[in-house]
Amino acid sequence: MWRLKIAEGGKDPYIYSTNNFVGRQTWEYDPDGGTPEERAQVDAARLHFYNNRFQVKPCGDLLWRFQILRENNFKQTIASVKIGDGEEITYEKATTAVRRAAHHLSALQTSDGHWPAQIAGPLFFLPPLVFCMYITGHLDSVFPEEYRKEILRYIYYHQNEDGGWGLHIEGHSTMFCTALNYICMRILGEGPDGGQDNACARARKWIHDHGGVTHIPSWGKTWLSILGVFDWCGSNPMPPEFWILPSFLPMHPAKMWCYCRLVYMPMSYLYGKRFVGPITPLILQLREELFTEPYEKVNWKKARHQCAKEDLYYPHPLLQDLIWDSLYLFTEPLLTRWPFNKLVREKALQVTMKHIHYEDETSRYITIGCVEKVLCMLACWVEDPNGDAFKKHLARVPDYLWVSEDGMTMQSFGSQEWDAGFAVQALLATNLVEEIAPTLAKGHDFIKKSQVRDNPSGDFKSMYRHISKGSWTFSDQDHGWQVSDCTAEGLKCCLLLSMLPPEIVGEKMEPERLYDSVNVLLSLQSKKGGLSAWEPAGAQEWLELLNPTEFFADIVVEHEYVECTGSAIQALVLFKKLYPGHRKKEIENFIANAVRFLEDTQTADGSWYGNWGVCFTYGSWFALGGLAAAGKTFANCAAIRKAVKFLLTTQREDGGWGESYLSSPKKIYVPLEGSRSNVVHTAWALMGLIHAGQAERDPAPLHRAAKLIINSQLEEGDWPQQEITGVFMKNCMLHYPMYRDIYPMWALAEYRRRVPLPSTPVCLT
């Protein structure tokens, strides 16, 4: 039986931590673990997901919940409430629903104070890790039988009805993910016609029906070339010389978005080496299975520009194709021949590897994310198969693996700090401090211990890194990468908790550490007034024309984001109230400029585009929270009036909101089909309207929304898992299972706190 371990480093000599592994979450399999009843509970959850996999595609993330609720001896003792047709919501009924949710959320907290969760959904995360272990000869040790069984379960359970796999679990089938998952099944032991429900044969038919793997996007071409299923001649060049360009050039890596930089860093190393893994009998079979013509007859030069229409979200501009062709025809032949291969290429490869080692060390070999992790790990193995760097990478592989009722997948990294920041704020909004004091104290401790205490090591600016001291990451302290909205939410938590008695919630954070957080936020505001996420924005927007991926948008340079801006305004307004003397003028200017950015980026229909959640509902909640914190109201701010109109217009008949993930790639509001509502979207919209003062004008829409949330609450006090709610890079969705626990409760807590409600009459006898 699978068991989640919390804050454990294990006995591996190649793993280390900056804070004794606080927030670390890893899974282990115990063949003798669990009672027959507990095993039956897991089997039932798996069967239920499988039977309903085409109706609700995100998992409920139930395995760790079963374990933690059992360990914490949780049993919901507060009776459920429902609101009938025509019935008013009373303060008492709202309180009951909030208490049930708060007690359940408290029971889900782990010993170190955080809330674990899957954060996955993209179907291209896991296969490259399997490829890497296959190439390096560590497949059996990293993925023994039970691991393989769960990986295959995940692949089977998320195969679309047409036989393919989408870019993410709710998406239409794509060549990229269908080919990757097909190869993954074959590496894990399935035959050409093997797999549950004829998975392999159906996938291969989909691939052939859509032109074969020559039509896989550029990232797929790279991985297939590394495996030896493709030829490097079929990939566009990724010259490592990029890393020795003069810094004044506009396309210098220092000007790139950090994730783009850290993907192409190891990719360019592997490309520069023209590395190819062992050509095994399986690789030769795959060459026969995946193409629509004999491998020897493939026109690799033509294949470079081929991409299946199902994968094509961002078509390459002509300028970009001309650049690739120039590099392919003229530059690469020169750089791969003497003397340039010795004078230039070797130096470029050495510099590239220096950057890879730096990024690995400063993230404790977690690396910035899962795509980058696998590429950097493979690059380290190519450099030295027996080196310590590769061994340190292997020690951190378990940090990325997650097991749910739908099988084992690879996390993007972790959302420990992100989820904890919102969970603590939601719990604070309940005003049930005495009932949940231990939960708040543990959450406070986790947040304080997770703050990044230092900047990246050494001369970090020469390694294209920004300050991180005082920030919070998305996951844990070891990860090391500052994020503006994570920092803002962490800062808000510490400030709010500092206003409560320390004997209840623990000692407040030292002012100097709060000042460090403020410094990070101030450093990330752009000239436009908006906040970037990881590093300062400012590179030329035209560089996006060089976006080499076909399925993402806006990935080349850092941008400003509505959510980061809204979060930062709220945090700094509260900080200014509690510490009025610290950098007063700078903070006032920051808030004024950030408000201007929010007003300038509002769309014509009154909404804001959400970059990290679905989508206009999500962005509008953050924007309205920021504007309200800065003193803007319905009366004095046209942007708020327009936003209120948008939210009221999109409310459903049942009182809820439901927005399709298609809003994100299409960049227009798309409602869920069938007039469905989603409790998480409803919570965001309800809180947005409360920020906008809707209770003072007409509370009826708020009552309708609250009724839907209350009536959707489950027996244990949580809410059902519905559609996927997270997104990144416009076109790929992320699954945040904790959102269904946090946001409906938070919205009800704000509703109970800020909307006047009648009390139930007391009958005197």
UniProtKB/Swiss-Prot annotation:
This is Beta-amyrin synthase. It is an enzyme of class 5 (isomerase). It catalyses: (S)-2,3-epoxysqualene = beta-amyrin. GO terms for molecular function: beta-amyrin synthase activity. One of its GO terms (cellular component) is lipid droplet. Its EC number is 5.4.99.39. It comes from Glycyrrhiza glabra (Licorice). PROSITE patterns: TERPENE_SYNTHASES. PFTB repeats lie at residues 18-58, 98-140, 148-189, 401-437, 440-484, 514-556, 591-631, 640-681, 702-743. InterPro entries: SQ_cyclase_C, SQ_cyclase_N, Squalene_cyclase, Terpene_synthase_CS, Terpenoid_cyclase/PrenylTrfase. CDD domains: SQCY_1. One of its GO terms (biological process) is triterpenoid biosynthetic process. Oxidosqualene cyclase converting oxidosqualene into beta-amyrin, generating five rings and eight asymmetric centers in a single transformation. Required for the production of soyasaponins and glycyrrhizin. Induction: Up-regulated by methyl jasmonate (MeJA) and down-regulated by gibberellin A3 (GA3). It comes from the Eukaryota. Pathway: Secondary metabolite biosynthesis; terpenoid biosynthesis. Belongs to the terpene cyclase/mutase family. The active site is at D485 (proton donor). It holds the Pfam family SQHop_cyclase_N. Keywords: Isomerase, Repeat. NCBIfam families: squalene_cyclas (TIGR01787). The gene is bAS1. Signal peptide: none annotated.
